[in-house]
Amino acid sequence: MGSILNPLYTAVSWVIISIHGLLAPIFGSTSGVTWSLSIIGLVILIRIILIPLFVKQIKSQRALTALQPQMKAIQAKYKDDRQKQSEEMMKLYKEHKTNPLASCFPILAQAPIFFALFTVLNGIGKNPPVKHGVLTQADVVNAAQAKFFGAPISETFLGSSSTTVKIVTVILIAFMSLTTFTTQRQLMVKGMPKMDSSNNMMLQQQKIMLYLFPVIFAISGVNFPIGVLIYWSTTNLWTWGQQFYVIKRNPTPGSPAYEELQHKKARKAGTVIDGATIDEPRPDEDIKGQRQQPKSKKKKKK
């Protein structure tokens, strides 16, 4: 297994050490700021690379939303035949060139990188430190001394007796869980079209994910090194910001965010929505700043 993941260890460690090399002259080679920013830099690079997958995820989610009426019709028609229902669903997905698993692509793509980073940081936390990838023995010794708000980045909640480590870990886990919850809720409240929640498979899955993912982070986070928690907290924050931008600037048709955008455009244009005139200028109003010509008076004949 280790030999298979060696290229990933090399890639992850090379990115971290390259960013570290740029920041070390400013903050110091053993500084927690240097190593923390190196991990954050890794997140930014990965998320930029994953933008095409994110675009595909958005398109797939919108396609699935548009197919909801047809999916409900298939479920009603073949409610007593699960196999036929699955076959018809797959036929529908194929016909419209969409994939219900596309929304998982960004997470799946990050999983190997996440595991590689976990292994690299876990090796740093061992006594003596174990190097992976392109890290030298001097690098792992420096990294082992690096601290994030007083807590070594290689320490874990369960593996340390330090109160500082436990406090920092709990704060990071809480931040991870909160950003995951708010990101998912933002999508459900603002980014999805209004639809009947009864027998709606997609909406039910979204509701499950809303509460399940934060719980998973809370349970598993106690085993992660602080450096990994920094990575995951940063990627969650990026996801929230990226989704906020998409919902604000390019919302899904039929969603509350889309309606808000249409009303905003209508107010600017002074058009009518749902029978109500929105800021429509009066035609007889004079344009501000335009000079009016004086009316000429007719002279009386003598």
Regions found by a protein language model. Name each.
Residues 239-302:
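Cytosolic, positively charged, low-complexity intrinsically disordered regions immediately flanking transmembrane
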Residues 46-115, 181-218, 244-248:
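Membrane-interface amphipathic helices and adjacent TM-edge segments
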Residues 35-38, 42-46, 50-54, 58-59, ...:
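Extended low-complexity intrinsically disordered regions
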Residues 1-37, 133-164:
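Interfacial loop/helix-cap signal at membrane boundaries in integral membrane proteins
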Residues 115-260:
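Hydrophobic alpha-helical transmembrane segments and adjacent short intramembrane/lumenal linkers
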Residues 39-40, 103, 227-229:
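Alpha-helical transmembrane segments and their helix-entry boundary regions
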Residues 30-42, 168, 202-206:
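Membrane-interface starts of transmembrane alpha-helices
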